[in-house]
Amino acid sequence: MSSVFSRRNFLAGGAGLAASAFVRGVKAEEQTPDQMLNELIEENQDSSLDSGFDNASRNVKLPKKSLPTLSHSTAQTTEASVAQYEAIVAKGGWPEVSAVAEGARVGVKSAAVPALRQRLATAGDLELNSGAPDVFDSYVDAAVRRFQVRHGLRPDGIVRDATLRALNVPADMRLAQLKINAGRLKTLTENLGNRLVVANIPAAQIEAIENGVAVTRNTAVAGKPDRPSPDINSKIIQINFNPFWTVPVSIVRKDLIPKMQAEPDYLTKNHIRIYDAKNNEQPPSQIDWYSTEAVNYKFKQDAGNFNSLGSIRINFPSPYGVYMHDTPAKNLFGEDFRFASSGCMRVQNVRELVYWILQETPGWSREEIDEVIKSGERKDAKVAKPVPLHWVYVTAWATPDGVVQFRDDIYSCDGFGTQVNAVKG
């Protein structure tokens, strides 16, 4: 479909076809989940849409972009939401949604829709008596989108596999998640300053928070389940522009050696150089790749648009040797499952985050940052006032606007493993 949907039609029902429609001239399937969420929030909050479409779409309650995951208010409302979910569990929870509903979208009539409606209504995503019971109409579309937003899934209004799995996590497990995370949030929010950066690992999301407001929110790619991103409390002290990448020994052992065995010109193609203990460059042919000899050398990737760190690296002290950085593999930001790194955090639109970090550092205006990146020159910026940084593990939280959110327990820290996980890697 090539026509541009109006704002009104986007939420009024036509948005159920977002996978093939254009919204504001941008293909929905080319947008990241956060971009789609921002579109949806903006549509929902536009007061000019009050007339002419159904109440279910108009009243869809979505999280406010300005509310941070980590705040005293969030800790309090998460604690309060426990009672809400205790009441749901006491009444028997919610029904299981049949696999027949998978792929359901606007316009579908199915015997599986009544259970879907009941499930969405129980958690507050839908008014139960809205619309025909067995029809997936715009009421259900709006409710599915809200549910997807609350669970960190692409808000396209279609009941795909990940959405179906999230729908069928039992209410008592969601309650247990809330209880665990209410305690976590109480501890995490004890000593927050006015200006900080928070990376929520299970959400694969980074927020810059100033005076209790999330001023930027960046989609991230976090560590693989077998190479998890660690919990961190540190301070951002330096920004590297157009950085080199020194490959960690763990990656040399786990990745580079097997790649060189399979593809002998891998290092050359990826602009990675080898240096011995005296900093003399060595050719790849000098190393026995069928041994562990390679771990005794330093591997350094040249700066450039091919570099694994992209154009920016954000530095902070930590015992784990991790950092936040740009990436040339930007396609991963559009995935529901964004756990593909070796522990570092890859940051979408990292330049926006860096603008904010360097706001109080003289000599690093937006224009100056853009210019140095464009030049390709290696430069470092020392942050004038180091910014507190927290990498946290929060899988359930409720913001003061009353929206309860859940994420997969990707590293099994809650003790549920894959039982609460909707997205597969």
Question: Locations of the language-model features?
Answer:
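N-terminal export signals
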Residues: 2-3, 9-28
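Short low-complexity, flexible loop/linker segments enriched in glycine and/or proline
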Residues: 3-5, 172-173
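Well-ordered beta-sheet/strand-loop patches within structured domains
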Residues: 29-128, 132-154, 161-425
